[in-house]
Regions:
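Structured alpha/beta reader/binder surfaces that contact nucleic acids or chromatin modification marks
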Residues: 2-195
Length: 195
């Protein structure tokens, strides 16, 4: 990865359950449309820390194997400290706009099909964005203090203090990542060509 001894401040906010799935190699996929206050989803930085969020996680929006791992929290709740355990390189950004594309991707993400269908239907003029992430774990996770600038319905934040990228290890092998990424990109392309 060639990032030893560099500092990184940029972070992508995502449900804690999704960050866990990415950080343990269970998925390489995130699906985004952007925060409510954003005009759409755009990748601002190709290399980011994964910042876990809790407020909008709902068990019924996840596949059963992930739903049982989520405890809903009250609106506005946030932890006093946040554990940053992984960094992601966003290797591909794939727009999808059809139900068929979404159905083809079902084995590769953690969300319940109804949640994905709802997200696709929200602001239908905007495509759903499939992000493929090459994830690296910190050998020792970094605990940071929560800051109010991290709150709100936005996808991207800058951490108050940058975190060193030293001691990052890939979650899955280069070969396994390449195989998964190729399969997912092919599914999206095949569905585009069917139109």
């Amino acid at each position: 990865m060639g990032l030893v001894n560099q500092q990184l401040q940029h972070a992508l906010k995502e449900w804690a359950i999704a960050v866990d799935a990415l950080s343990t190699g269970k998925t390489i996929v995130l699906l985004r449309k952007g925060g409510i206050r954003e005009a759409g989803f755009q990748v601002q930085q190709p290399l980011v820390w994964l910042y876990p969020t809790y407020e909008h996680q709902k068990p019924h929006l996840l596949k059963p194997e992930y739903a049982s791992k989520v405890t809903p929290v009250k609106s506005g709740w946030h932890p006093q400290t946040v554990i940053i355990k992984s960094c992601a390189e966003i290797t591909q950004v794939l727009p999808v706009s059809s139900k068929e594309q979404i159905e083809a991707l079902q084995p590769y993400h953690i969300w319940h099909e109804q949640m994905i269908s709802d997200r696709l239907g929200w602001q239908p003029q905007r495509p759903l964005i499939v992000l493929l992430l090459r994830v690296y774990r910190l050998a020792i996770p970094k605990t940071i203090l929560y800051d109010s600038s991290y709150g709100g319905c936005k996808s991207w934040i800058d951490l108050i203090e940058p975190i060193s990228q030293d001691n990052l290890n890939p979650v899955i092998s280069d070969d396994e990542y390449a195989i998964q990424a190729q399969k997912i990109a092919a599914l999206v392309s095949a569905k585009f060509n069917d139109k």
